[in-house]
Amino acid sequence: MKIEVIKKEQDLLEFYLEGEDHTFANLLTETLRENPHVKFVAYTIEHPILMARKPRFRVVTDGKITPEKALEEAAKKIFDRAKEVLDAWEKAIKG
């Protein structure tokens, strides 16, 4: 995974997330939408063949937090949820 920043302002961040596709892009988008300070978030894949694994994101916040902080919080939330799934899976296997 590689992040390439395209545009950065106080309450706006546009970036490419190289090496990912719709699976992670949807997860990140939905997790960002849960943050009340995120006013807009969306991604697009600009070309289905040439850029299939390089979604372009746009994140806009209300100015109370930066888009970078919103992304940091979303990443932590995704990690915590993945850990919950792993713990539940391990518990289910052990019976």
Curated annotation (Swiss-Prot):
GO MF term list: DNA binding; DNA-directed RNA polymerase activity; protein dimerization activity
Enzymatic reactions: RNA(n) + a ribonucleoside 5'-triphosphate = RNA(n+1) + diphosphate
UniProt xrefs under InterPro entries: RBP11-like, RBP11-like_dimer, RNA_pol_Rpb11_13-16kDa_CS, Rpo11-like
Predominant subcellular localization, coarse grouping: cytoplasm
Domain of life according to the entry: Archaea
CDD domains: RNAP_L
Entry-linked Pfam families: RNA_pol_L_2
EC numbers on record: 2.7.7.6
KW Glycosyltransferase (keyword) present: no
GO terms, biological process: DNA-templated transcription
Transferase recorded as keyword: yes
Key words, A-Z: Cytoplasm, DNA-directed RNA polymerase, Nucleotidyltransferase, Transcription, Transferase
Record family assignment: Belongs to the archaeal Rpo11/eukaryotic RPB11/RPC19 RNA polymerase subunit family.
Stated role: DNA-dependent RNA polymerase (RNAP) catalyzes the transcription of DNA into RNA using the four ribonucleoside triphosphates as substrates.
Known partners and oligomeric status: Part of the RNA polymerase complex.
Name this protein carries in UniProt: DNA-directed RNA polymerase subunit Rpo11
Name of the encoding gene: rpo11
